[in-house]
Amino acid sequence: MTNKGWRAALVISAGIGLSFNASAGFKVVALGVNGGVEEGNLTSYLIRSDDQTRYVGLDAGSVLPGIGKALEKSSFPDITAENSAPLTPKGAVFRNLISAYFISHGHLDHLAGLIIASPQDSKKPIYGSAETIDTLRQYYFNWKVWPNFSDSGSGQRLGTYRLNAPRPEQRFSLGLSGLDGVIYPLSHGGVSSSMLLVSRNNESFAYFGDTGADKLEKSRHLDAVWRVLGNEIKQKRLKGLIIETSFTNQMPENQLFGHLTPALLLGELKNLEGYAGGEGSLKGLKVVISHIKPSLTAGADPRAEIHHQLEQNNHLGVNFLFMQQGDSLEF
């Protein structure tokens, strides 16, 4: 990693928002960055175009706690108590700035925040694969687990959320955000997951839900995604991506359950490099590492270990970034 990259990673790890590019195309805010265990900091990000004000939620494991932390870190500098009234600043971001959600798959650590906060949310669409939308409809918004705040499914339909399952690999509009999206399937230990390619103004950003490596999943889903992103890189459109690395390299492959390690991620990114133009084509690519699973073992620091293992073998020149809850970045 370059000196600039190391400084960026250190600043982000300290919890300070940072802009790398004066002509940034997207702003990303981390509402939650962990891959489980602690319910207040679960996977959830916001993204918007730099010429728009409304965000799309990228998963929703922890929403309101993350908004609170982001406000503390001035990640929403235009939101004040005065211009939020009669709402709180947290309420203004939640109800007014988040215009839509994309849910990558139906696991609880990716949507618990949306479910819990739904009674006070404003009307907005939720996008996901057909499998994800069906999971929301059947197993969450069903008046057994939770009241039905959607516009379909069983019992009274309260209609806060419009459930949408766009066709895979076809472009659609992401609510009122001004962003377009395309959903691609991923494999997550036998569970259907997905990646969202966000685009606007001939620029793009990729958000990955949970995924295992193709060789372990007996799948070609990541290979298909790398082909798409390789072309985005060749066309100089891809501004960055968020992808999981849940475990350190010490985790046995038969205990990954559809997740990545640093070694597996680097192997997959090597495949992307081939589609992006060959050696050196990923140099400087900003890759946010997400979904690290915290440990309850004394002295263990999986975040630091994953960071070390990625950098130790980073022969691709990728700029690995580690956001903390509440941080914002421009791409």
Which sequence ranges carry the predicted segments?
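Bacterial N-terminal signal peptides that target proteins for export
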Residues: 1-10
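Active-site neighborhood of phospho(di)ester-bond hydrolases with catalytic His/Asp-centered motifs
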Residues: 57-61, 97-109, 127-129, 207-210, ...
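Pre-active-site segment of Zn-dependent metallo-hydrolases
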Residues: 37-102, 106, 112-119, 217, ...
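Active-site HxH/HxHxD metal-binding segment of metal-dependent hydrolases
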Residues: 89-156
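Metallo-beta-lactamase
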Residues: 131-193, 315-329
